[in-house]
């Protein structure tokens, strides 16, 4: 989205507030409460309050303002961001071994996101609904059911798209941030002493005074920056400048005022630690605050769900996940998609998490490991891009990496303390996703290599067919080919069993480029291989969905006319059997067979009319 038009800049910035900052913007609901709840062995003491506030503020400055907004967002692929984009950029100018390591890092980062995304909707909505405990303590037993009801409605509306609802996101989130600022400023005015915590020496003093406990407490401080990856991942939707402008003009001031306002309240009334956010508000404002907090957390959850859809589509297009049904919910915006399988799997996981953990404080113990792990990987990948792609001085890049890791590694290490109390959850989910992605990619490669290892030359076969043609039948046949120089299995089996060939034969290859979009001018490449054979290569970006009808429309514009309803599409359908393998590779093979059986069929994947498809089966041992 361009920001060149100055008149549109305020609207784009407002939209960025509504989508990008939902997660990090709802962190004040629970962050300071978890920091000072007594779990680390100290209560609401002046030095502890000042120390935590100083840590939170300077984390927002260093991690969000400097690392992500200033440095990481420089690394874009045609304006797009995200951990898989960073992985792709980092591996462009490196050796094969280094590229493999970077790919593994990127996949781990993507897997971590899947692990955390189960927790974000649960902890966000529950922390808002828990405001009921302040309004009416007798309703505390309704927190879990109400949280499930709210999230059920949210997941149910996904299939209708969020375009209409999304128009409300920005004004609601802007109102939310203004409320954060207003509540915090009101409390700070009553106790301005709290502003001393802006001095970073209070963070240093905190470590010196509380020693080992202060290090472990970093696991709670990191809650203030959860959602920071969204800034980079959503860069393609809004552009760098609007995201930066929204942060420095609205989000950062509002968060700072609210955190320090909560600190001022706790210095004055330590008993407010049971829920310092809601106790900032006067009694008459509690119910309206509860309502807008619930709306803000729903918006934060929506942003995460949309992020999962986008990451899944990117992983599918790059070949790391099996093809699945992707529905476009907007004719105008290609980024608005709905993936039913992912939506309902995520819903089931979120409900299980809510029922199992019962309170947002329990979920806070599960939060942070995957976030900080992704931060470490982002530091390594982004500095690799700076060195290999931007050709920055290696010593300067090394200093940047050391500075980032000096913050990231302590945060990650501190969160490892949460492993047994809930941190195992995102790690387990992330591990499962990593195994699934690497299994699909490696076994798919093994299958393709197995299918084509004994293949003949395509050029030689075409020359032979033109010289001694079989029976020719009227019409056009399209054979889907995974590689441009390989004879499609369906073509070989059609000749073997039916012993006929159509008057025109098109070998069609759909490939994904290392870019989010491919310009229509470069969409289709046509090459005539002989009098009756053509090769068509259609290129798509990883944010685009291939459409065969569109491909042949482009072919018609370039002189190769082809009517969809008068064309036969031949595809091979592999029946896979496992060969002899070690037990661990056999398990991986069985997982691949399960994924293959449930993958979206090629005709549905490429939107080919079912009555024009002929599938020819073949058995392959892998």
Swiss-Prot record:
Which cysteines share a disulfide bond? none
Keywords from UniProt, A to Z, are: Cell inner membrane, Cell membrane, Ion transport, Membrane, Potassium, Potassium transport, Symport, Transmembrane, Transmembrane helix, Transport
Catalytic activity field: K(+)(in) + H(+)(in) = K(+)(out) + H(+)(out)
Q: Which residues form the signal peptide?
A: none
Residue ranges annotated as coiled coil are none
Q: Where in the cell is it found?
A: Cell inner membrane
Topological category with respect to the lipid bilayer: Multi-pass membrane protein
Gene Ontology molecular function: any one: symporter activity
Q: Which Pfam families match?
A: K_trans (PF02705), K_trans_C (PF22776)
Q: Which family does it belong to?
A: Belongs to the HAK/KUP transporter (TC 2.A.72) family.
State the protein's name: Low affinity potassium transport system protein Kup
Give the classification, highest ranks. Bacteria, Pseudomonadati, Pseudomonadota, Gammaproteobacteria, Enterobacterales
What's the encoding gene here? kup
